[in-house]
Amino acid sequence: MTRFRLWFLAFALCAPALALRAADFDGSRPFVCALIEAHDCAPGVACTKGLAEDLKLPTFVRIDFQGRTFAARGRTSPIRNAQRVDGQLIFQGSENGRSFSVTVGETSGKLVGAVAGDGEAFVVFGACTLVP
């Protein structure tokens, strides 16, 4: 009986946290993402794979889905299109001759993004956490 009570108590304490975790990346709160791996691509050559910082990309980006902003290295770009689709936040924008498209998993916080410009493209993979 004591073992059952301990399991029940553990479940009762953890269940609210699990419910909150599932709603973490629903777009209601800003979050910060670490860009981990990136691929730098150009026509006619193989893509270069490396850490985002090695490819001179920002290490961190701040995303405010409600405020429709995407910020890195002191620069802020407007999010022109934002949607929640099948458990993912999806948003796009453009600035300085480049377009970006980013997807963040609502439950995982995993980020996949692409930036495209004239004869160049970057694909990035990262992980996000909520802003305290």
Predicted regions and their residues:
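Hydrophobic/aromatic beta-strand elements that line small-molecule binding cavities or substrate pockets
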Residues: 59-61, 99-106, 126-130
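Edge beta-strand at a domain terminus
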Residues: 51, 118-132
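Contiguous, well-ordered beta-strand patches that form the walls/edges
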Residues: 65-100
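Short, exposed beta-strand-loop hairpins at the edges of beta-sheets
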Residues: 103, 111-123
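Positively charged n-region of N-terminal signal peptides that target proteins for export
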Residues: 1-6
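Sec/Tat signal peptide C-region and signal peptidase I cleavage site
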Residues: 18-22
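Bacterial N-terminal signal peptides
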Residues: 7-17
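Short, solvent-exposed loop/hinge segments that bridge or flank secondary-structure elements
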Residues: 27-66
